[in-house]
Amino acid sequence: MVAQKSVSNATFKNKEKPQEVRRANIVAARAVADAIRTSLGPKGMDKMIKTSRGEIIISNDGHTILKQMAILHPVAKMLVDVSAAQDSEAGDGTTSVVILTGALLGAADRLLNKGIHPTIIAESFQKAARRSVETLLEICHPVSLDDREDLIRAASTSLSSKIVSQYSSFLSPLAVDAVLSITEKDSKTVDLNDIRLVKKVGGTIGDTEMVDGVVLTQTVVKTAGGPTMKEKAKIGLIQFQISPPKPDTENNIVVSDYRQMDKILKEERAYLLNICKKIKKAKCNVLLIQKSILRDAVNDLALHFLAKLGIMVIKDIEREEIEFLSKSLGCKPISDVELFTEDRLGSADLVEEIDSDGTKIVKFSGVKGVNAKPTVSVIIRGANSMILDETERSLHDALCVIRCLVKERGLIAGGGAPEIEISRRLERESRSMEGVEAYIWQEFAQALEVIPTTLAENAGLNSIKVITELRSRHENGDVNEGISVRRSGTTNTYEEHILQPVLVSTSAITLASECVKSILRIDDITFSR
């Protein structure tokens, strides 16, 4: 009898463990979602993060906050990955996707407590998500890239929740112009790497400007009296050093008398002069030199020779900038002086050093060439590095919104209107279903209301009253009825110009449901040796 009892006990324990693991996973993931819930919407709060290196970051961008948080639980890290996926797919809605995932996990937890199998929940959630995406595409308004006003409104909605919201009327057109200037008419893709964001401390955010072409923060080298402006520029981008070669660290050169020393100096002069002559022979008159950590990228004697030959020199080009510069200027990086030929050079009408709000920058105007791609530089201004970083992130989000509209040319009303409409339609469709699936769809529909509820709470409104009012308006056919923080209540958000790309919402719902499916299918966590 005793043996039989212990067997049944063991079986009971085994059944209990997966439920405990699942519950612990859901609690961990929801804790992450709750941590950033207050940062959603125009009245959302910012988070101050102190990194391990002592840097201070102030942001309300969901992906930035989660990326910097010290998260230990492996399932909680999945929410960070979901936020990163939303950032790369849509660029905006990184907070919404995490909050939505947390709400769906809460719904799943309630369903698990009712004894419904996790696989059935996960699959029904996926079906409901697919139906939600179909609904979003039905209610979205088509948009043309020629309709500049609609694009600006969509960018303004994205910027309204950021620190830079007061400058949204200025930054939104800038973001639209930047994306459209690098996008072909019928293209469905935009490479945001073709837009270079350059940060400069000084001035205010209102001094931010867009430059059609290339801007470098490095200044022209003037120590040897070289030129600071070149018309009809032929631009060379080199990755080798114009300085005497050094021996290896293990080797030494011993000089016993002054004649040998004189010979070494003569050799150095001849070596450097030979390199400079080869550069001049290829008709290059503007030289960009990559930063080197092994030895001087260019020494004073070489600068003297280059100045005498009338070549403008800009040194300390970062390795990360090489690809952008070669693409923008149409020049190929040159790793050896023997490969320095005219066909590898880029060309521009004018290269000059200009004074921009008290700081010097190098501007390339009228870039032309077979290999040159259209690129844009945006010079971001701000009082300190924290404001600059947050402005860069905000502007990146606005650029991503316009990129979304190039990919999927549809706009939907913001302010929680689409979520309420999907919720209403799913609930209506669930009534015609049979069995457990109807119950799961109802929970999914209720979970979607977390977005308008959070927007209302963060704006200091009575969320229950607002959601009830929205539901009744949507029942009467007002599909664009959402929350307006400006009006402190409900309004037709489409007419109020609170707009967002349909891709942001479709991507958020799809990613959230996939993440929930992954979490629900985990029934144990083991640690490898």
Swiss-Prot record:
Cellular-component GO terms for this entry: chaperonin-containing T-complex
Subunit note: Heterooligomeric complex of about 850 to 900 kDa that forms two stacked rings, 12 to 16 nm in diameter.
Localization, UniProt: Cytoplasm
Pfam families hit by this protein: Cpn60_TCP1
One GO BP: chaperone mediated protein folding independent of cofactor
Record flagged with keyword Transport: no
Top-level taxon: Eukaryota
Organism field: Candida glabrata (strain ATCC 2001 / BCRC 20586 / JCM 3761 / NBRC 0622 / NRRL Y-65 / CBS 138)
Keyword Zinc: no
Protein name (Swiss-Prot/TrEMBL): T-complex protein 1 subunit delta
Major subcellular location class: cytoplasm
Gene name linked to the record: CCT4
InterPro entries with a match to the protein in the record: Chap_CCT_delta (IPR012717), Chaperone_TCP-1 (IPR017998), Chaperonin_TCP-1_CS (IPR002194), Cpn60/GroEL/TCP-1 (IPR002423), GroEL-like_apical_dom_sf (IPR027409), GROEL-like_equatorial_sf (IPR027413), TCP-1-like_intermed_sf (IPR027410), TCP-1_chaperonin (IPR053374)
Family: Belongs to the TCP-1 chaperonin family.
Function summary: Molecular chaperone; assists the folding of proteins upon ATP hydrolysis. Known to play a role, in vitro, in the folding of actin and tubulin.
GO molecular function term, any single one: ATP hydrolysis activity
This protein's UniProt keywords: ATP-binding, Chaperone, Cytoplasm, Nucleotide-binding
